[in-house]
Amino acid sequence: MTSISQRAPLLVPRSLVTQLMALYDYPHPLQRGRIIRGYDRSHAARTARMCAAVATALGHGAERVRQYQIACLLHDLGRAGLDRQLFGKIWSWAKERAIPTRPLEWRAIHQDTPYGRETEAFLRCYRKDLEAHGIAMTAWAKEQVEMRLGYSRRLARRLRTVRPAIKKMGVTWAPWMQQVMLYYYYPEKLASAKPWVRQLAEILVACEQFEAYSNQRRGRDYYVRKKETLVDAFAYLETLQQEGILSGPVMGTLRRLTAQGEFDAILEEARGCAFTRGERRALRAMES
């Protein structure tokens, strides 16, 4: 039997993981000499472990999965510099008012928004309201908006900055690695992607959202949530499947591995506490 420590492992050396995680560190634009430490690096590591396990179970080759896990480790790079307090204020305010947080959802409501200009449209619509709420919409605050509604361009900027460092690490960066990182916010960008790229992108969305919905810290800071439940996690994934973002094979494999206990230790770490007996029974029945 596979031991807990060997389940859903990191496939790249710890030394490389440490180097990659350092790419999330960001110089504070308002306080010279201060570095904003990458937010929730452990979320990225847990997500990457889950992604590699699902990709392997779906038959992707070892070298591709290793390269994929590197992309998954960096999937939040477009949010390097996330200011927990400011980001939380802006997006909790938006959530209370049911304001879309993904570009596709924004354009569905605001159909006159030019593609790629969702951040600017958000600011035009809500700047005065946010400032009346006590949130000054400085250039730094605008970046916190861009981390969601302009994720593609912010990720591209950050990748341009760190690409030389990635190369020095001996990592070969392929275009598909950036593509899979964008799928949750920009599914349309993978409309003509190869099936295997699309599947890896789906896996990242499924695992990242599953971990995020189990993540106590992220729930408090990012989703304005006070409690983590497995029911909520899979309910959201099922919504994404109904929307065509996730496919049956990806969801089925995630359920099977979850039922087999592949992710128990990862999810308990994310929650900050052990599962109850009832929760563990629910996990074991996840495939049925």
Task: Name every feature range the model reports, one short phrase each.
Residues 4-288:
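Histidine- and acidic-residue-rich, metal-dependent catalytic cores
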